[in-house]
Amino acid sequence: MNLEIRRDSINWHVKINDLKEIMSSLQREGNYWEGQVFLTKRKKEYNLSFRIFLNSNDEDEFDVTDGQLILSISDDTFSLLEEYTVMVSEYGTPFAHELNNLYFISLKKWLGCHIYVEND
């Protein structure tokens, strides 16, 4: 997996099996999945909320057939992710970060993120 930061979006490349594991750990809320980003700092654990929205063409499912789905994150979360790599945890936590500093994050405006699904 790798994370590519653009001016107004994040491109996240992930293997399809890892994506399935992430999606199965998320909680369905209306027309989006909601979960937590787990942050670790000197043996302390923090978390941030995030949402994966469904495909706008069909609110009953998200689209991975063309190799991507849309993830939306807040402005502050976007700024935080610019400096750190996102990795899938093997033990149930969707994302893990090693942080030098922890910033207060308030969920405000949402930015777009494309997740490109790699078949292998």
Q: Which residues make up each language-model segment?
A:
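Positively charged, low-complexity terminal tracts
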Residues: 1-120
